[in-house]
From Swiss-Prot:
Functional description taken from the UniProt entry: Cell division inhibitor that blocks the formation of polar Z ring septums. Rapidly oscillates between the poles of the cell to destabilize FtsZ filaments that have formed before they mature into polar Z rings. Prevents FtsZ polymerization.
Gene coding for it: minC
SUPFAM superfamilies: Cell-division inhibitor MinC, C-terminal domain
Subunit structure of this chain's protein: Interacts with MinD and FtsZ.
Assigned protein family: Belongs to the MinC family.
Name by which UniProt lists this protein: Probable septum site-determining protein MinC
Pfam families, alphabetized: MinC_C, MinC_N
Keyword hit for Cell cycle: yes
Keyword Cell cycle applies: yes
GO biological process terms held by the UniProt record: cell morphogenesis; division septum assembly; regulation of cell division; regulation of cell septum assembly
Keywords annotated in UniProt: Cell cycle, Cell division, Septation
Length: 228
């Protein structure tokens, strides 16, 4: 029996979500361009989701689409849209609408207690992480016992530990766990992110550059402190 020419498989990806609070295309374009210029290696040609939950009706979707793409970003979908007229306008502009799975109320599943004494998996990297490399620790913590070059990317659903110079990007809590943290012995990252809350390099306090630091969320905002 010959193999099918295609195969559909479920998967998951880490995408940046841009929340629009203004419907003026030029204002959006300038704001996005500033972000892209701050971290071109991370954001240039990056796939993004546009969240329109707080955007007023009546936006020109063709112009907004052009504003986002002209800043060097690629729209893969629109989320947060609840208004039917707005949905039709977005569809006419050729933009895909994404469902965030909150529309239907499901009966709660019974809580199952986890088995005791089950060790938490951890992915350990013992070699340097080079520019262009991406390492993803699915459903576990990530430990890197070496340096991370600029242009490299670390992603973990759990915590991230870097025992070396960190010049790349670190995204902890990628599946949305706001309790995750980032620990680094020599912080010089292009970007740090926990559960979608992120700082670009120029937002990291300069006092911590090259220093040992711990990052976590406090009241849904990134915070940093010395790692002793």
């Amino acid at each position: 029996m010959s193999q099918s020419p295609i195969e559909l498989k479920g998967s998951s990806f880490t995408l940046s979500v841009i929340h629009l609070h203004d419907s003026r295309p030029e204002v959006i374009r300038q704001a996005l361009q500033e972000k892209v210029d701050q971290a071109p290696a991370f954001l240039k040609n990056a796939p993004v989701v546009i969240n329109v939950a707080t955007l007023p009706n009546g936006a020109n979707w063709k112009d907004l689409q052009q504003a986002v793409t002209s800043a060097g970003l690629r729209i893969v979908g629109i989320s947060g849209c609840q208004d039917e007229r707005q949905k039709r306008a977005i569809a006419r502009a050729g933009l895909p609408l994404l469902s965030e799975g909150k529309g239907q109320k499901m009966a709660p599943e019974p809580v199952v207690s986890p088995p005791e004494n089950v060790p938490t998996k951890t992915r350990i990297i013992n070699t340097p992480v080079r520019s262009g490399q991406q390492i993803y620790a699915r459903n576990c913590d990530l430990i890197v016992i070496s340096s991370v070059s600029a242009g490299a990317e670390l992603i973990a659903d759990g915590n991230i530990h870097i025992y070396g110079m960190m010049r790349g990007r670190a995204l902890a809590g990628a599946s949305g766990d706001a309790q995750c943290q980032i620990f680094c012995t020599h912080l010089g990252a292009e970007l740090v992110s926990i559960a979608g809350q992120y700082w670009l390099s120029d937002q990291i306090p300069s006092d911590y550059f090259g220093q040992a630091a711990r990052l976590h969320l406090l009241d849904n905002a990134l915070t940093i402190q010395p790692l002793n």
